[in-house]
């Protein structure tokens, strides 16, 4: 039996059958266009050997398409009604693929590796505006087995995630996601392919985790790097010397550490790439050690 994807009429009929009304607080807008669904799944690079963590499966459009690729899917849905309905929908529109689906009714921000029987190798997510960045950073940190990410978010969030250093959209999210891997845009998604129709465009972003990380990835090191990123963007128009003065203990010490990391102290924090923040932390530790030895 070939998997049948959900169209607009089917999605609305299914919602009516289970007496479901989309909730804005959960960012519930469901893709009903088959071409868009196939485009997203194709761009994700998911194949039959993957175990996919699907965040926000909703009524099941993307989940069906992921199963159609032969992947195993763990779908995490915060809405209890949708989580309860999803296995039935998958069974009705496929055949043996239901055996490759696991559904959890849980808040993604609380999900931990111990909650899953199989650790995911890929993440496909449709994230609402208010939790997009925290959820993405949480999953990247807690699930190092995830090698690739395809996320659909509001267009402005997509622009921030994929922005380059020095650009107007470059900020804390841009720098932090690059701690984990390479980031690139995969185009826009029109509001008209959703039900209900949102007021804004969505954007697709793919993240590929570094094959071998250029820097340590332990939680303590990551937290220190992220602290530097937060400091730099708290007053993004300040020079790096002034921005890091309190952290370093003085303006002069800030300049010394920046120079040790081959960073011009007059540069603004908004121009620093993730490698700059990492180098600043590492060279600062080396500089402090040299001072103690002297």
UniProtKB/Swiss-Prot annotation:
Question: What EC number(s) is this enzyme filed under?
Answer: 2.1.1.182
Enumerate the Gene3D superfamilies for this protein: Ribosomal RNA adenine dimethylase-like, domain 2, Vaccinia Virus protein VP39
Q: Could you name the domain of life of the organism this protein comes from?
A: Bacteria
Residues annotated as binding S-adenosyl-L-methionine are: 29, 31, 56, 77, 107, 126
Under Gene Ontology molecular function, one entry of this record is: RNA binding
Localization of this protein: Cytoplasm
Concerning InterPro entries, the annotation shows: KsgA/Erm, rRNA_Ade_diMease-like_C, rRNA_Ade_methylase_Trfase_N, rRNA_adenine_dimethylase, SAM-dependent_MTases_sf
Keyword RNA-binding applies:
yes
Which Pfam families does this UniProt record tie to the protein?
Answer: RrnaAD
Q: What class of enzyme is it?
A: transferase
UniProt-listed PROSITE patterns? SAM_RNA_A_N6_MT (PS51689)
Keywords for the protein's UniProt record, in alphabetical order: Cytoplasm, Methyltransferase, RNA-binding, rRNA processing, S-adenosyl-L-methionine, Transferase
Indicate the transmembrane segments per the record: none
Known catalysed reaction(s)? Answer: adenosine(1518)/adenosine(1519) in 16S rRNA + 4 S-adenosyl-L-methionine = N(6)-dimethyladenosine(1518)/N(6)-dimethyladenosine(1519) in 16S rRNA + 4 S-adenosyl-L-homocysteine + 4 H(+)
What is the recorded function of this protein according to its Swiss-Prot or TrEMBL entry?
Specifically dimethylates two adjacent adenosines (A1518 and A1519) in the loop of a conserved hairpin near the 3'-end of 16S rRNA in the 30S particle. May play a critical role in biogenesis of 30S subunits.
* Family in the record: Belongs to the class I-like SAM-binding methyltransferase superfamily. rRNA adenine N(6)-methyltransferase family. RsmA subfamily.
Return the protein name: Ribosomal RNA small subunit methyltransferase A
Q: Which organism is it from?
A: Mycobacterium sp. (strain MCS)
């Amino acid at each position: 039996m070939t998997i049948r994807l959900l169209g607009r009429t089917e999605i609305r009929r299914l919602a009516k059958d289970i007496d479901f009304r989309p909730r804005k607080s959960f960012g519930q807008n469901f893709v009903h266009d088959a071409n868009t669904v196939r485009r997203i799944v194709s761009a994700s690079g998911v194949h039959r050997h993957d175990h996919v963590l699907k965040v926000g499966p909703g009524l099941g459009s993307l989940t069906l398409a992921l199963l159609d690729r032969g992947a195993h899917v763990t779908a995490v849905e915060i809405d209890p009604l949708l989580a309860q309905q999803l296995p039935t929908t998958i069974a009705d529109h496929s055949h043996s693929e239901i055996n490759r689906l696991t559904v959890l009714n849980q808040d993604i921000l609380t999900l931990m590796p111990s909650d899953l029987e199989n650790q995911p190798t890929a993440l496909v997510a449709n994230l609402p505006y208010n939790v997009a960045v925290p959820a993405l950073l949480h999953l990247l940190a807690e699930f190092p087995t995830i090698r690739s990410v395809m996320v659909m978010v509001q267009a402005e969030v997509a622009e921030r995630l994929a922005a380059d250093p020095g650009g107007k959209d470059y900020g804390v999210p841009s720098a932090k996601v690059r701690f984990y891997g390479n980031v690139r845009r995969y185009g826009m998604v029109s509001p008209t392919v959703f039900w209900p129709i949102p007021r804004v465009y969505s954007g697709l972003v793919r993240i590929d985790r570094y094959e071998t990380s250029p820097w340590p990835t332990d939680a303590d090191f990551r937290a220190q790097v992220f602290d530097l990123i937060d400091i730099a963007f708290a007053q993004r128009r300040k020079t790096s010397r002034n921005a890091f003065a309190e952290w370093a203990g003085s303006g002069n010490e800030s300049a010394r550490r920046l120079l040790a990391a081959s960073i011009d102290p007059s540069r603004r924090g908004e121009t620093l790439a993730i490698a700059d923040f990492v180098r600043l932390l590492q060279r600062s530790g080396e500089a402090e050690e040299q001072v103690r030895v002297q």
